[in-house]
Amino acid sequence: MLEGSHSRSDVPRSDIRIAEIDGLRGLAVLLVLLWHFIGALLPQTTVLLKLVSGTVIFGRTGVDLFFVLSGFLIIGILVDRRDADNYFHVFFARRALRILPPYAMLLIVFWILTALLPAGYYFGHQIPWWSYATFTQNWYIIKLNNWGPGGASVTWSVAIEEQFYIIFPVIVYLIPRRHLFPLLICIGTGSILARAACFLLYPQNAFAPYVATFLRLDGLCAGGMLALACRDAHLWRTMIAHRSTLMKVNGTFAAFIPFFLVALHWSPGTTMYYWGHTYLTVLYSLTLATILTNSNSRLSAALRLGFLRALGAISYTAYLVHPLFIGLAFTVVGKREELKSMSDAFLLVLAMLVTLLYSKASYILIESKLLAIGHRLEYSARGSGSRAADLSGPSAVSKGSQLQR
């Protein structure tokens, strides 16, 4: 596997591991952890605490970053490998080896704790087991109009990605490559409009526009469009030629973050569902485009830091299990989950340490070994033909699929 050694004049391929993308994963999960461990639990009793909470709430947007990254990585892999005889077999096998083991471990621990501990916000049976097992819990959340048990609440986004993994391999396989970019534009735009319409027509269900799959496809599609742009020789050369402009535009969008936070404070639903998620999709897509084309920028250097890359390696499991460990810490001592005292802070630090240690152990003992098995499942090349001709392009020769979350 090549790692961080390519020039940014080269087209990114799915067999090259880009260090900055690992750093972006780490940043995404760090944002979520900061929100759930600090911002969401602070009392709104003073101006300072309101200011801290109102700033750290930006951590919620880590999920939007994950969606853009997933769209970029998965669509890139699918496009690079759509000519393989074992296209579906290898893709789904690798996805299963990556996604299912940490997810299954979470559900097992969650169901055991639900049976042992008193029912409360974090543990309960509000969402049936089969919904988690079939990755349909996001639709059950819409039905309930609440998160369900907090210990497994973040799995709604995993459900969306799993549904994406099922549908888009078929789309990429069947649709000619030249039609994929406009198709992603249409799907992404439709998702943006449908999300706004849903909130306008059904404001009483604030969860639907947040967790419904077809209302959250814009980030995944934007990442996919960037993957296609990187695999088009003309578009890639254009991006390289205008890399400084990309960086400036990205900086301009980032400078808009304080206004976004103020709007989010005063009107969360209106902000997020009418324009907030769209803004974040553009911001994070520009950020990804910037690091792909500017390896010498300060942003790229920051994302190559060992801390962020190490966090990126365990980001999936840490994202999955951290609410469960927060809930476990407070439930065992019979306290409400909040950050009002030193004892609360101690419980949260303990939950954070357990989250990181569990995630690291899971990665070393289980996930890394299963990923190695997945990488031994190679895509087989098909002989020349119409589909092979359709793949002709800058990255049709890529050999592996190392860039999988």
Where are these regions (language model features)?
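Alpha-helical transmembrane segments in multi-pass integral membrane proteins
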Residues: 1-20, 27-30, 34-60, 74-89, ...
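Short alpha-helical catalytic segment bearing the HExxH-like zincin motif
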Residues: 22, 91, 155-159, 165, ...
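Alpha-helical transmembrane segments of multi-pass membrane proteins
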Residues: 23, 93-106, 172, 309
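Hydrophobic alpha-helical transmembrane segments that constitute the membrane-spanning cores
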Residues: 105-113
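Function-critical hydrophobic alpha-helical transmembrane segments in multi-pass membrane proteins
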Residues: 148-173
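Central hydrophobic cores of alpha-helical transmembrane segments
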Residues: 183-191, 306
